[in-house]
């Protein structure tokens, strides 16, 4: 299953004239790099323009920003650095995000969790990273378990990691694409269950699939999506993410992160149109 990206599997059959659009999110400092950090232990965030994306949950000198350091199918991506096990940094799309004490929370929903068909991203681990070899930037779907946005104790999310889906050592110095579908294993934080709850009563708490979680939380709504690094990642990590995509009730949203168009005026957000040839470049990735 790791041989190909499910998201773009149809690309090979497309004619050159076929196109697919992605919303382009530019750095706040476009055409320069962003580098948001926070030295304290209290989560802090920053809006990425008015795009609905946020640098979020940044603490203990974690770093996140749209940069040209590790470009993906363009001139940028979302770059992360974690200098220690206490550091953390995320980039998040939040439904009607609001600032609460310097960090951002969702005040709305993107739709029913039951209608989430898939989500995906591309990620990169730099070979200079000294944290555990299986670690890579993770992708999360953020949820309100009972669907009532006025009760917040049941908020949390589900996390994708390759190590719980047949992976072992994360590839380095190359872009990797992963797609999360109904049979993909996810583990939880929060949602009124604590950490890594064993909802399917197996001997292992990390083998509940997306479909299992949807059955367990039939009333849940989606608050947003999150990619990031830390905490608990001892030693150092550097890497990036891009091409974050989700499909909810048949509607697909794809986001590409760039520092800015070459020599052009920057719309906000922009729209990138990929030909089939460009799409082939976008998905020429290593899959284990």
Please report, for each region that a protein language model flagged, where it lies by residue.
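C-terminal cell-surface anchoring/sorting signal
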Residues: 1-19, 270-288
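Extracellular carbohydrate-recognition regions
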Residues: 23-55, 255-259
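Short carbohydrate-recognition loop motifs
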Residues: 60-92
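Secreted extracellular polysaccharide-interacting domains
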Residues: 79-116
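Short beta-strand segments enriched in hydrophobic/aromatic residues
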Residues: 82, 123-125, 143-145, 229-231, ...
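A short beta-strand element within beta-rich, extracytoplasmic domains
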Residues: 115-127
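Extracellular ligand-binding interfaces
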Residues: 124-204
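Terminal, low-complexity interaction segments
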Residues: 175-264
